[in-house]
Amino acid sequence: HVSALAMYNQTMKYYPDSNPDEFKSIPRSYIGLVGRATYDWKTRYMVEMNVGYNGSENFAPGKRFGLFPAVSAGWVLTEENFMQPLKPWLSYFKLRASYGVVGNDRVSGNYRFLYLPDSYNPSTGSYYFGNSISTAWQGAVESKIGNPDVTWETAAKQNYGVDAYFINSKLKVNFDYFIERRKDILTNRKVLPTYLAANLPIANIGKVDNKGYELSVNWRDRIHD
């Protein structure tokens, strides 16, 4: 059995803030293409491939689009002839593996349009010029520094698993081992000289590796009718 899907997606959120009665921000928009193909042979061999090509307004032209593929495969060994003698003691046994890349364009603090040039806001303080100290002038402060090179944060995820059912599926055991490598994390540098008096721009500078395993055991039986 073979199936395929292709989809174009374009969304625009008109109320990015929590209060829908106020237009505190301009609309937030995304655009992308999604594709999927699956293959299943007698519920024995299964393969699925997915791909996403997404665009975000947070990045500069040339940096806005990211390609995020994923693939997974499964093998049900209990559908093989050589495994039949083990039934019903081993009711179901499946090996599976998957690999995929996902992207993120959001930043803590809900910053937007990270690539735009520096912006300035009126200063809350006053400044004096010349010999007179009786006249104060309002100034401006640099509120945000843009970064035209900022782009998608990505996370590559691997998963390897085993599903085993015993004794007519009364005992079910599921095991997963996962590895995640996240890179180009969107964040800003926290260390800078105090005399710089500026907010450093958002950049792709973070990196986190994570791995672990999950094990679940479930027993389900009927005591009597």
Where in the sequence are the language-model features?
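Extracellular/periplasmic, surface-exposed regions of secreted and cell-surface proteins
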Residues: 1-225
